[in-house]
């Protein structure tokens, strides 16, 4: 189980609810808009992120259920997303899986055993933010719509042009 804190944990509507405003990392800021964004407010921002991973989805769901039960009356679930399967290649012996559009996804991901690359691109280094963030990381989540039925009607050559690589 991984926990992440959104900007609202530090300061929300100008109120320092938990005495943490002075500990907010400068880098924790709203993302700029992307061309074609159709973001929905109910799936945007938030104070706390919980990611529960398991080889058995029932274990992950049960963990989140227990946490939400404990937090009843103090916190509520704004939105949840169930995931499935390995969605990226993280070790040299893994094959790159295909996404729902049929394209390999994650081929260029940083490998879990490449400590230098992880230190450079994933983990917060000493001096790159508040001391409590050293060794931590940032998470960005964007819900996207994958219109598979529409995609399946697009010619292969056009799909490859859109994605920027061959299938």
Where are the predicted features?
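Long, histidine/aromatic-enriched segments associated with O2/redox biology
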Residues: 1-167
């Amino acid at each position: 189980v991984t926990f992440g804190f959104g900007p609202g944990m530090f300061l929300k509507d100008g109120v320092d609810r938990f005495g943490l405003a002075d500990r907010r990392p400068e880098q924790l800021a709203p993302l700029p808009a992307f061309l074609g964004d159709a973001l929905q407010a109910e799936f945007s921002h938030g104070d706390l992120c919980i990611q529960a991973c398991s080889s058995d989805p029932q274990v992950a769901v049960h963990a989140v259920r227990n946490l939400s039960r404990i937090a009843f009356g103090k916190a509520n679930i704004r939105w949840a997303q169930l995931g499935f399967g390995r969605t990226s290649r993280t070790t040299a012996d893994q094959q790159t899986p295909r996404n729902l559009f049929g394209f390999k996804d994650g081929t260029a991901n940083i490998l879990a055993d490449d400590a230098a690359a992880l230190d450079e691109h994933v983990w917060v280094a000493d001096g790159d933010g508040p001391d409590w963030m050293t060794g931590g990381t940032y998470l960005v989540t964007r819900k996207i719509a994958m219109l598979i039925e529409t995609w399946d009607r697009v010619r292969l050559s056009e799909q490859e042009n859109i994605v920027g690589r061959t299938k």
